[in-house]
Swiss-Prot record:
Lineage, uppermost ranks: Archaea, Methanobacteriati, Methanobacteriota, Methanomada group, Methanococci
Key words of the record: Cell membrane, Membrane, Transmembrane, Transmembrane helix
Major location (coarse): membrane
Annotated GO biological process: cobalt ion transport
NCBIfam families assigned to the protein according to its UniProt record, in alphabetical order: ECF_T_CbiQ (TIGR02454)
Protein name: Uncharacterized protein MJ1571
């Protein structure tokens, strides 16, 4: 195993000329490392780790819904601060947590919101004039809307991420089963979660194999052809893996229902945390609407 790893490492060092390939490899490896990294925080002692799983999911969803209902930047900042405080009290390194929350999805949301800032999408007071004839500018109303939208997405992600970081996956599936989520949804989600790692390793193996057999840099058309072949091979492998997994489950007595073992009990501290989330969310939403 170590010999194969050393060969792969040597191939990467000698042939890392294609920047797109480099970035793809790096992204996949980081994805795997981040998931392994966050898994260990489900087993440490912290605020959210000690909350019963059903209560935790319901409470974080309540915070998330409150963030969606909020329309003002100040309210969203307060919700975001609550998420950071919960992460800190759960002994999660804030730097890693912020990277997880803000690196991709909020940036993507901000890019989507860019057109809304212009006067032809959101008329209003000009903040920055780009062209006079035709008149194209960034308006104050559009800028506020874009910031609010991006911050709302970031806040929702910050609460959603806390669930898998602080809860073991088997407890998540058992908890949502207790909450009445259909068994089919749980089964599909469970299989997807468990086999995504195998598929990512298969993608890595394909990339290593392709790189070890390429001498010269491929042109754009050749790269597209190779990418198409890789996607086709991945699809076939995924289909075969799904069939094998299904027949293996049938051979072991699977009848469409998975047995869930749930041993957690609701305690006073769990009820207190649920009441805290309800009261804080209600107060912030009322404050956002100008009622308080």
């Amino acid at each position: 195993m170590f010999k194969i790893y050393n060969i792969k490492s040597r191939i990467i060092r000698e042939n890392m000329n294609n920047k797109l390939f480099d970035k793809t490899i790096e992204h996949v490896i980081k994805y795997l490392n981040e998931n392994i990294f966050f898994e260990k925080y489900t087993r440490i002692s912290g605020l959210l780790q000690n909350i019963e799983s059903r209560i935790k999911i319901i409470s974080l969803v309540i915070f998330l819904v409150g963030s969606v209902l909020s329309k003002h930047i100040l309210t969203l900042i307060i919700f975001n601060s609550i998420a950071l405080i919960l992460a800190y009290l759960s002994n999660i390194p804030l730097l890693q947590y912020l990277k997880r929350v803000y690196v991709f999805i909020p940036i993507f949301a901000g890019i989507i919101a860019i057109p809304v800032m212009f006067n032809f999408m959101t008329p209003g007071k000009d903040v920055f004039v780009i062209l006079n004839n035709p008149h194209i500018s960034i308006t104050y109303e559009g800028l506020i809307y874009a910031i609010t939208f991006t911050l709302r997405v970031a806040t929702c992600v910050s609460f959603a991420v806390l669930i898998p970081i602080t809860t073991q996956w088997n407890k998540v599936t058992s908890a949502i089963h207790k909450l009445g989520v259909p068994e089919v949804v749980i089964t599909i989600t469970n299989l997807a979660y468990r086999y995504i790692f195998l598929l990512l390793n298969f993608v890595l193996d394909m990339m290593y194999s392709r790189k070890s057999r390429v001498v010269n840099k491929l042109g754009m058309v050749e790269s597209w052809k190779e990418a198409g072949k890789a996607i086709g091979a991945l699809f076939i492998k995924t289909y075969q893996m799904g069939e094998d997994x299904y027949y293996a489950m049938l051979s072991r007595g699977y009848n469409g229902e998975i047995k869930h073992i749930y041993r957690e009990e609701i305690k006073i501290k769990d009820i207190a945390f649920l009441l805290f989330s309800i009261i804080i969310t209600a107060l912030l939403v009322l404050f956002d609407r100008g009622i308080l």
